[in-house]
Amino acid sequence: MTKRILVIFLLPLLTFISCSDDNEVVLETPLQKSDGIITSSAKEQGLNVKLLSTMIDEIRAGHYSINSILIAKNNYLILEEYFLESAKGITAIQSVTKSITSALAGIAIDEYNLLLDTPVINFFPELSHLDWSNEKELITVHNLLTMSSGLQWNESALSYNNPQNDHNLLNQSDNWIEFILSRPMSSSPGSVFNYNSGLSIVLGEIIGRQTNQSIGQLSISKLFSKMDTEFVSWSTENSGVYQTGGGLSFLPRDMLKFGLLYQNGGVWNGEQLLSTGWVLQSTTQQGPNMEYAYHWWLASFTVDGQVYESFYAWGNGGQFIIVINELSLVIVFTAENFEDNLLARANSWKLITDYIIPSSVE
């Protein structure tokens, strides 16, 4: 029995990490599939293989609570590691969905004449009975994208296990859009950042109404089918409103594709799916929060005194797509750290600063 247990635990290491005759550490090149991703070896792309293998050992030892990690360098997938068998499958990407909603907003703006300064009230004539006073009528599409609507909303300050979290109250409501837009105002639109998944849902409904098709149809025709994405589900409420704040499920490789799409200015396999202008605009600070753009987060990593700017998609529990253009890096993490979302980010950030960036700059 002891021998069988040792074989089970050692085989993953032997599969992905080996040594040549001169004791050089070798990472196995990720599998080349027909999904549009091109693979290469870490060594061929100039990364420090020994440092990356040390990182993998640390994760396998349980120090970072990571389910999977994928790294692309110079547009090549050079590392693909799964630390749970289930992590190879479809992952609920949580609020990473918001960044995909941002991409669809860009398509609606560039191709369907959606205007950022359009008041939200214009899209919902059936909700004219709501109280639109106290500047609520001034909320625009731009305010939705920057999480600065001014609507009263308590989400990030409470655990998602707390029944009083407005995100949970939203899920219990019969009409998501009316529940969100019926909230009273707590500040002027554009003045205060307040994380609100409801705004992403309202944004998704606006995109659907502006393009005269469902978010599901738009995402498949404009993005997913062109990127060979294994689209599984996008949850909706009973009336058909899409959960564009956190309802998508992807394979980790499909998450990586989305990061590569943005790193390449909206181009995937030679086709311009998003305008370069929108990619730049949506990943640059636009509102009152220095760390937030249009449904993308912003971060700086400092390694050996050098600062590397990045933008990233962040989903509850440790789902990340991180793009560091200066180093031509795209990094994907999946995890299940739902009890402490900030710890999940800290774990991933430590891997980036201690291993991934150093391995890429040597």
What are these regions (language model features)?
Residues 199-206, 246-267, 319-335:
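Active-site-proximal alpha-helical segments within enzyme catalytic domains
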